[in-house]
Amino acid sequence: MRYCVDIDGTICTPTVGRGYEKAQPWSDRISTINKLYDEGNHITYFTARGMGRFSDDPDASVKASALLFDLTEQQLKDWGCKYNDLILGKPHADIFIDDKGIQCDDFFNDNGS
């Protein structure tokens, strides 16, 4: 199975403004995702980091990735996250409507975190 997992507010504390370096990991949630990885599932971390500041730019995802990919990759490593892919460029939005979506608190409550 393939899982696409957000970062801020999902596996770490939400950040205010541009303070991504201040995010603190939620170890129980990371352990849940790592277990899925260990069971052979494909894990992609997909984040909107940096997208708000470039929202009107057609190259927003490229610019966000150039600005924050290294920091985000290092955080995932430092936090012990196991994954297959890291993608920056998730559109900045207040609400996502998706036929395969699940609210993160519901997912982690159902999976023992």
Which role fits each region the language model picked out?
Residues 1-113:
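Catalytic phosphate/metal-binding cores of nucleic-acid and nucleotide-processing enzymes, i.e., regions
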